[in-house]
Amino acid sequence: MLEKFTVIRGKAVPLRGEDIDTDRILPARFMKVLTFEGLGQYLFYDERFDEKGNPKPHPLNDPRYRGATILLVESGFGSGSSREHAPQAIKRAGFKAIIGESFAEIFFGNATAIGLPCVSLSPEDLGVLFRSVEENPELEVEIDLVNQEVRFGDRTAPLSIREEAREALVEGLWDPIGELLEAGELLDQFDQKLPYPRRTE
């Protein structure tokens, strides 16, 4: 059974900038891997480290946001290539959800398919959330997919997410391939009913 996402709680890290593309999220040279294991360490690598591997000023290097599990972004996040390595890197870096103004369509689909909810807030509510987290890095943020709202401090903001994605996340049906693999016997039964020629021994 896949995880059901109803309420996600955690500290957030604010990442400002519009139209952040997948090549910035995960530089292409780190995509030459057979599995996604370990991709989290390369998240925003070229923006976080210099050529010698020394840390640069970046929210993900800021000790105030250590342990954050929610990523705050602005509009057009995840544009660029269609590879799923970018959302995989975000998830494997320990993030459980992303809050932004808008997301690239393919990135949104890839993120949903690995159980990484991406929810949108209005520019006004997102701006308040950014400022609140920057002023208080310890602020707890709640993403309620059932009631479709984000809560932080004494504020509640309505979130938006495609209904089919929300239902899949809430019901634990977000990984279609995983669902197929778990339905082994049903698939075999269905296969036996298909009207195509079968090889006889």
Curated annotation (Swiss-Prot):
GO molecular-function terms, A-Z: 3-isopropylmalate dehydratase activity
Annotated Pfam families: Aconitase_C (PF00694)
Transmembrane feature ranges: none
Cellular-component GO terms for this entry: 3-isopropylmalate dehydratase complex
Catalysis: reaction(s): (2R,3S)-3-isopropylmalate = (2S)-2-isopropylmalate
Biological process according to GO: L-leucine biosynthetic process
Keyword Lyase in record: yes
Pathway: Amino-acid biosynthesis; L-leucine biosynthesis; L-leucine from 3-methyl-2-oxobutanoate: step 2/4
Superkingdom of the source species: Bacteria
Database matches in Gene3D superfamilies: Aconitase, domain 4
EC nos: 4.2.1.33
Alphabetized UniProt keyword annotations: Amino-acid biosynthesis, Branched-chain amino acid biosynthesis, Leucine biosynthesis, Lyase
InterPro entries: 3-IsopropMal_deHydase_ssu, Aconitase/3IPM_dehydase_swvl, AconitaseA/IPMdHydase_ssu_swvl, IPMI_Swivel, LeuD
SUPFAM superfamilies for the chain: LeuD/IlvD-like
Subunit structure: Heterodimer of LeuC and LeuD.
Cross-referenced HAMAP family: LeuD_type1
Known function: Catalyzes the isomerization between 2-isopropylmalate and 3-isopropylmalate, via the formation of 2-isopropylmaleate.
Family: Belongs to the LeuD family. LeuD type 1 subfamily.
Listed name of the protein: 3-isopropylmalate dehydratase small subunit
